[in-house]
């Protein structure tokens, strides 16, 4: 994962990638 990570309601995305 990159330094910037965003957490969504159901899924989390890192550096524009969803996992």
Swiss-Prot record:
Keywords of the record: Antibiotic, Antimicrobial, Bacteriocin, Hydroxylation, Lantibiotic, Secreted, Thioether bond
GO molecular function: signaling receptor binding
Positions bearing the Lanthionine (Ser-Cys) cross-link: 4-14
Location relative to the cell: Secreted
GO CC terms in record: extracellular region
Chain positions of cross-link Lysinoalanine (Ser-Lys): 6-19
Location of (3R)-3-hydroxyaspartate modifications: 15
Chief location of this protein within or outside the cell: secreted
Superkingdom to which the source organism belongs: Bacteria
Ribosomal protein as UniProt keyword: no
GO biological process assignments: defense response to bacterium; killing of cells of another organism
Transmembrane segments: none
Sites of the Beta-methyllanthionine (Cys-Thr) crosslink: 1-18, 5-11
Post-translational modification note: Maturation of lantibiotics involves the enzymatic conversion of Thr, and Ser into dehydrated AA and the formation of thioether bonds with cysteine or the formation of dialkylamine bonds with lysine. This is followed by membrane translocation and cleavage of the modified precursor.
Record keyword Secreted present: yes
Protein family per UniProt: Belongs to the type B lantibiotic family.
Biological role: Is a potent inhibitor of human phospholipase A2. Exhibits only a weak antibacterial activity against B.subtilis, and does not display antimicrobial activity against S.aureus, S.mitis, E.coli, K.pneumoniae, P.vulgaris and C.albicans.
Protein name listed in UniProt: Lantibiotic duramycin C
